[in-house]
Regions:
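A short acidic, Gly/Pro-enriched loop at the edge of an enzyme's catalytic core
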Residues: 106-107, 169-184
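Conserved class I S-adenosyl-L-methionine
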Residues: 108-117
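Conserved SAM-binding loop of SAM-dependent methyltransferases across substrates and taxa
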Residues: 118-131
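Helix-to-beta-strand junctions that scaffold the AdoMet/dcAdoMet cofactor pocket
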Residues: 129-130, 226-228
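S-adenosyl-L-methionine
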Residues: 138-176
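Class I S-adenosyl-L-methionine
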Residues: 178, 231-234, 239-363, 368
Length: 468
């Protein structure tokens, strides 16, 4: 990309970055002459990274950090390959991939992603939890929360609850509850300038200050939900010190029970820059801790740039834990329909404990999830299916959380054959075998359900996901 074709960057932003970066500024500016890096992260719940690399028909270049991450050419259209529909990988900016592994949740822990849409970091957290423990993924935006639900479903996350609440309401219900909390805060999006016309067009100094004010309140709510001894990751995709070091500094000034944590440094990790806060009134102790934060830059590594600060909540006396959700017993008819489906169509059914109905939808609720009554939620757990008149119909979420060994009937399609696209378009195709529900797979990886009747497989791939 030539300088003449460089995206039109706001001049006030460039002047500020030149003042802050000094000798680094020419390299930073030159990064806008380069195409954006496209990242791909393997779904380790389903496939080993190297196995994915060997299977795909296009080249993947491994990144040194984080694990399971690759560089991929946009020209290959990786989002159109059937393996993407099977949830074998997520397309994500490499900088954004650093947040979840720095938070480093362990299997069995309780984890919150407070502003989770569209799901890049939430799916990463799900992989690290290995379907053990609890993941609460929250998104207040009424449309974006469905993108989040779709991506976690495709990922095969079986231990996730998806809520659509304000941070303040969640904080009232989950005090001192989570082992780890991720807040990828809404921001001015300066790290999106190379990719997004809208981000460049909407940027203004007033936007930066407005975001910083909003972030302070959201971070306070996030902190209230972290247990003593727990770890919080605060991140943004902006370079503005007011939203990065400034938000963390203001938080530390009013939260004496939190301290910054120094992460293990990887190639391309630059320190926080508290000196950019200028005359903002920040205590010396808070300023000293800000250098432990991580800044990722488009001129020093792959990706568009990110800010990450890890904050540990100090230990204190033991507190009373929240009780798990006391689920009502399923109606007899619902139990019968579900058990009939499992007996006729599955070899290994999901565990029958912690089953719950939300309307006509049947879920398996993650262990340890407190009562969500009164909160807005999309899914309170793994969506198994829907109770309809006289029967149980399996969900897309159930299909994506199973393996071929779990079901009685499988229709396996070749990723290079036209039949897989026929299925993804929602069309029927010839398929010999016993009648009934069939798990449709691509090269052995689940894509969704089909129903076979007299040698014809009717696609039950969800209408909203179908190829056009």
């Amino acid at each position: 990309m030539s300088e003449q074709s460089r995206p039109l960057i706001p001049q006030a932003f460039l002047a500020r970055m030149e003042r802050w970066l000094g000798d680094e500024y020419p390299a930073f500016l030159a990064s806008y002459d380069q195409p954006a890096t496209n990242g791909l992260r393997a779904n380790t719940l389903k496939i080993a990274p190297e196995a994915l690399r060997e299977r795909l028909p296009f080249a993947l270049e491994p990144l040194t950090w984080p694990p399971a991450a690759f560089r991929v050419s946009e020209e290959e259209q990786p989002g159109r390959h059937p393996y993407h529909a099977a949830g074998l990988y997520y397309l994500q900016d490499p900088s954004a991939m650093s947040v979840a592994p720095l938070l480093a949740p362990q299997p069995g822990e309780r984890v919150l992603d407070l502003a989770a849409a569209p799901g890049g970091k939430a799916t990463h957290l799900a992989s690290l939890l290995a379907n053990q423990g609890l993941l609460v993924a929250n998104e207040i935006h009424p449309r974006r929360v469905w993108d989040l639900a779709e991506n976690l479903e495709r990922w095969g996350a079986r231990n996730a609850a998806i809520t659509a609440e304000t941070p303040e309401r969640l904080a009232e219900r989950f005090p001192d509850f989570f082992d780890r909390v991720l807040l990828d805060a809404p921001c001015s999006g300066e790290g999106m300038f190379r990719k997004s016309d809208a981000a460049r067009r909407e940027w203004a100094a007033e936007l930066v200050l407005g975001c910083a004010n909003r972030q302070t309140g959201i971070l306070d709510a996030a902190a209230r939900m972290l247990r003593p001894g727990g770890l919080l990751a605060y991140s943004t995709c902006t370079f503005a010190a007011e939203e990065d070091e400034g938000t963390v500094a203001r938080f530390l000034e009013t939260h004496a029970d939190f301290e910054p944590v120094e992460p293990a440094r990887q190639a391309g990790f630059a320190p926080g820059r508290p000196e950019w806060l200028g005359n903002e009134k920040v205590g010396e102790a808070a300023r000293d801790g800000l250098g432990r934060a991580v800044r990722l830059w488009p001129h020093t590594g792959p990706g568009e740039g990110h800010f990450i600060a890890l904050l540990r909540r100090c230990e204190r006396e033991a507190h009373e834990d929240l009780p798990g959700w006391r689920l009502p017993k399923l109606p007899v008819e619902a139990t019968r329909f579900y058990e009939t489906f499992c007996r006729e169509h599955l070899q290994r059914a999901p565990a029958t404990e912690r089953l719950a109905l939300a309307g006509s939808y049947l879920y398996q609720v993650p262990a340890g999830l407190p009562d969500l009554g009164g909160l807005r939620f999309i899914h309170p757990g793994w969506w198994l299916g829907t109770l309809k008149k006289g029967r149980f119909e399996p969900s897309q979420g159930l299909a994506m959380g199973l393996s071929p060994a779990d079901v009685r009937r499988v229709a396996n399609l070749d990723s290079a054959a036209p039949q897989v696209l026929t299925y993804l378009r929602g069309e029927s195709l010839p398929n010999a075998g016993a009648d009934g529900w069939v798990l449709v797979t691509v090269d052995g990886f689940p894509l969704g359900w089909g129903k076979r009747v007299q040698g014809t497989l009717k696609s039950h791939y969800p209408r909203g996901l179908r190829r056009v």
